[in-house]
């Protein structure tokens, strides 16, 4: 196995860097979330058992997106998402997706019909046409700091070691095969990334949770982070990002992404083009960290989507066949105008408007889809015009 050698001395900094793509083929592969303790490719690829049983694995589904994301790394996305209501799952907004994609939960395929995002975080909620058999409870407390966490993802293999002064201080990120894995960490702090991201949970790669200590990498976005609350594991975060890239000098020409036990002596890109030297001292290691969007900071928005708290409207009351027609009833709000669409193919569409400019009354409104009973089976959805 060839190593990426990084040689550092206090007061001077001399480095020899082997380009990552030349050496990853010789490295031990570790798939999805990365571990300090082992290179076993089968490690934690099944549901946790014992004291960690029912700690979140059962709530994770496969969110397969067709839109190219991070084109240099993968042509499509095979991410994770978490059901949080009978017809809603949550994931990361930056992995995109569309209503032409599918979400697979416990072997059953679900078809998204609508997406909800917010300017305050990297969260995206997707509504599906079908109904989930169960879904994850949300962490509603504010006591995440110092809490043990279960982490789920489908990220990269572990790459080659990053060796500093003869010590393996981390591993580069390799390639991914989208295998789901689980690991453990501890929430070290809550921090705010500002407009568009908001509060995130910070977890460091410092080995404080034993052999299951993990970091996240490319492909882990959208995976859930769970915290135990009164014996119940609740969804507390959605994987967003990790520290890096790193470099041996203050340029980006030889930068690399890595999970670092100790980043001391390396440069880290803190903002695009801005490299900051991590102090190389003997006092304490400087582990890299990963960040997950904080659920508890976004509860008002989440509940407004999954509970329709934006108003009592946009909830389907029922569809009844009356003769050869279908009668679609739905809740409305006053001073709002609606439209109703239908499709015979919820996966590929297209959706056709059967009626528009339906005035809301503050109660149940019924509209008619003429001759629907003699047509192929249809799906309906309601939209807000104003």
Predicted regions, residues:
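Extracellular/periplasmic catalytic domains that process cell-envelope and extracellular macromolecules
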Residues: 74-75, 82-84, 96-97, 104, ...
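Catalytic-histidine neighborhood of serine endopeptidases
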Residues: 85-121, 131, 144-152, 156-163, ...
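Chymotrypsin/trypsin-fold serine protease catalytic domain
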Residues: 129-215, 219, 236-258, 262
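Acidic glycine-/aspartate-rich tracts in secreted/extracellular proteins
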Residues: 94-98, 129-134, 154-159, 189-193, ...
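C-terminal subregion of chymotrypsin/trypsin-like serine protease catalytic domains
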Residues: 28-59, 66-67, 72, 77-95, ...
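Short, composition-biased motifs enriched in small/polar/acidic residues
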Residues: 307-386
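Bacterial N-terminal signal peptides
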Residues: 14-26
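N-terminal secretory signal peptides that target proteins for export/translocation
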Residues: 1-11
């Amino acid at each position: 196995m060839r190593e990426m050698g990084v040689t550092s001395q206090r007061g001077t900094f001399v480095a020899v860097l082997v380009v990552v793509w030349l050496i990853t083929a010789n490295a031990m592969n570790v798939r999805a979330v990365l571990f300090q303790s082992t290179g076993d490719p089968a490690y934690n690829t099944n549901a946790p058992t014992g004291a960690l049983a029912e700690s979140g694995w059962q709530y994770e589904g496969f969110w397969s997106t067709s839109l190219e994301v991070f084109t240099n790394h993968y042509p499509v996305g095979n991410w994770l998402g978490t059901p949080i209501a009978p017809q809603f799952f949550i994931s990361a907004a930056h992995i995109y997706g569309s209503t032409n994609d599918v979400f697979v939960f416990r072997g059953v395929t679900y078809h998204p019909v609508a997406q909800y995002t917010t300017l305050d975080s990297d969260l995206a909620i997707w509504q599906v046409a079908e109904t989930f058999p169960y879904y994850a409870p949300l962490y509603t407390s504010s006591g995440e700091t110092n809490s043990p966490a279960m982490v789920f993802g489908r990220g990269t293999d572990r790459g080659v070691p990053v060796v500093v002064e003869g010590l393996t201080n981390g591993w580069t990120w390799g390639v991914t095969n989208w295998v789901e894995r689980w690991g453990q960490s501890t929430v070290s702090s809550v921090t705010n990334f500002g407009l568009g991201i908001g509060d995130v949970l910070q977890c460091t790669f410092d080995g404080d949770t034993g052999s299951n200590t993990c970091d996240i990498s490319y492909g882990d976005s959208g995976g859930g982070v769970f915290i135990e609350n009164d014996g119940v594991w609740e969804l507390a975060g959605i994987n967003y990002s990790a520290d890096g890239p790193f470099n041996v000098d203050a340029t980006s020409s030889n930068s690399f992404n890595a999970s670092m036990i100790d980043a001391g002596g390396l440069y880290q890109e803190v903002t695009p083009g801005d490299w900051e030297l991590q102090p190389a001292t003997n006092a304490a290691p400087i582990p890299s960290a990963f960040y997950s969007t904080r659920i508890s900071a976004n509860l008002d928005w989440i509940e407004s989507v999954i509970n329709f708290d934006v108003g009592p409207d946009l909830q389907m009351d029922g569809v009844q066949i009356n003769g050869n027609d279908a009668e679609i009833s739905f809740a409305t709000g006053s001073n709002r105008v609606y439209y109703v669409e239908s499709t015979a193919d919820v996966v590929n569409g297209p959706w056709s408007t059967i009626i528009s400019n339906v005035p809301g009354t503050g109660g149940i409104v019924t509209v008619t889809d003429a001759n629907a009973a003699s047509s192929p089976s249809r799906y309906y959805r309601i939209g807000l015009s104003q």
